[in-house]
Amino acid sequence: MAIYAVVGTQWGDEGKGKIIDFLSSKIDYVVRFNGGNNAGHTIVVNDKKFIFNLLPSGVLQGAKCILGPSVVIDPLILIQELEVLKNNNIKTEIFISDKAHIIMPYHIKFDELSEQKKGIHKIGTTKKGIGPCYADKINRIGIRTIDLLNTEIFANKLKTNLEEKNQIIEKIYNDKPLDYDDILNTYKKYIEILKSLITNTEKILHHAINSEKHILIEGAQGTMLDIEHGTFPFVTSSNTLITAAAGCGIPISKIKQKIGIIKAFSSRVGSGPFVTEISNSIGDIIREKGQEYGSTTKRPRRIGWLDLLTIKKAIALNELNHLALTKLDILNNIESLKICTAYEFQGKIYDYIPTSCETIEKVRPIYKVFKGFKEDISNIKNYDDLPIEAREYIEFIEKEVGIQISILSVGSEREKTIFRNQEWSNI
């Protein structure tokens, strides 16, 4: 039995989808433990691009897929993704936790209206209803997938919630109320499609562990968007750390292989402090070469140099023992590359990320500068064949964080991957 966990070390969009995809080739179960359709992961197989927002990345390898209790589910999006699998003749088993919460139309409405009302102070959410859905969960008024299996229970909870939500929509936001019958009838159609997938996933995972099955746990977003440890309030609404995987029913002590995904540069979607942000044309070049646009929102991502403070924080919080570096190929033909090693503010050197966003906004990055490499590295298969400049960049990261980068991605396709030890190439 082997249980792997994969998490992002930055602000999401690190390239987790590709890494998870090939790790899933010999995995029995892939489990998503957090977030909703605000996360997007892109996988390229045989020159065909797949983008999923809810289904785990391992779905293309035939692993059984579980959406855990802490995932919030938009039924329409999930149905659309299931249709993609069907249309591409991809056969797999999908299990939805009966404890997972359901995104309702009023959650999406609240998300949109709240962002509008905040104006220049908006968080920059995806407006998918994720935050309002988690808020209802915390307030203990959310609708769970188990409620969908009993029409009377679902209808009563919807009625109670909608009466309260419509009061807020009308009186606080001066907008039109939502219609109860429209929502009920629409969701009844969703229920017919999804009800056979809703089950006790905790029981399935316990059986899998006892049967010594191989399990891969997949996190959405990244460490710096964690609700507790990220750049609050410019964060997501869920816990993104490996510790949150316990919510799936898998004891943390069982997870031996913890893999952190690092993008060779930094990116961020939406508002919030971004110390290493590149404000000149180099940022634009990296964005275009790397196609750095949100999988979910299509918004252009903000681009920055690699920030080692975020990587060190992610390693410490997640107890990572393996690293994968992605999109190294995007950095070719750039004269100088930079890595941030510390921050400075008012004469004080920070080797950690301050808690206050107001402080983070004011710090100055301290950089180590590297000579760039010109070669196209996207077809290189062996580490020693990489340009010396690329290897110096990689080895500096390893020296600073104390963990070997075992996997290098030099292109979006599965085969454009360099393994630095036999353990990963044989999985």
Swiss-Prot record:
Record-listed GTP binding positions: 12-18, 40-42, 301, 327-329, 409-411
An example molecular function term from Gene Ontology annotations: adenylosuccinate synthase activity
Disulfide bond entries: none
Keyword check for Transmembrane: no
Binding site for substrate: S295, T296, T297, K298, R299, P300, R301
Entry note: cofactor: Binds 1 Mg(2+) ion per subunit.
Record's subunit section: Homodimer.
HAMAP family: Adenylosucc_synth
Protein name: Adenylosuccinate synthetase
Species whose genome carries this gene: Borrelia duttonii (strain Ly)
